[in-house]
Swiss-Prot record:
GO BP terms: dTDP biosynthetic process; dTTP biosynthetic process; dUDP biosynthetic process
Protein name, entry field: Thymidylate kinase
Classification of source organism: Bacteria, Pseudomonadati, Pseudomonadota, Gammaproteobacteria, Enterobacterales
GO-annotated molecular function: ATP binding; dTMP kinase activity
NCBIfam families given in the database record: DTMP_kinase
Binding site residues for ATP: G10, L11, E12, G13, A14, G15, K16, T17
Family in the record: Belongs to the thymidylate kinase family.
Pfam families recorded: Thymidylate_kin
Enzyme Commission number(s): 2.7.4.9
Native species: Escherichia coli O157:H7
Amino acid sequence: MRSKYIVIEGLEGAGKTTARNVVVETLEQLGIRDMVFTREPGGTQLAEKLRSLVLDIKSVGDEIITDKAEVLMFYAARVQLVETVIKPALANGTWVIGDRHDLSTQAYQGGGRGIDQHMLATLRDAVLGDFRPDLTLYLDVTPEVGLKRARARGELDRIEQESFDFFNRTRARYLELAAQDKSIHTIDATQPLEAVMDAIRTTVTRWVKELDA
């Protein structure tokens, strides 16, 4: 079986870290043990510096980061990660488990920020070509639930401090995109933890077994 790229998506507080652990456990039970883990933005020395710039409230002092500058920093970090980490890992037969990928930009910047969706799609295609995750698990929570969990973790980053309206628009775009793409599987992450974990196990197990069919 060829190596695959699995991405976990969702609003802040959706439970991506727990989901990643369940994905890893499930893959190991299916005999897949050669894995690497990525996060976006980040995952390389350059991408981590860009992460600090785009997410740290104090990184540029009082200067306002424009919406388009924000998008371009996300894509700069993303293409660096894809070309230097993800693609080489996949070529070597290693599975890649990612915390966020391009769907985040389409939802947060296209939905939350209201940036032209055609422009974002064009930019994605120019930067990434036809490279896409093989499977995306979208953990769906309301902003009220997700941000309550995020705030319980401690200090919020620049984007986590956006308004409920911003996150409602982001969630709506996530759901819209998930409905259009069969590779995106929506998990109701407002359920009790064990139910969410079971849903992830079932989804990943069924998907991997279909690869072997």
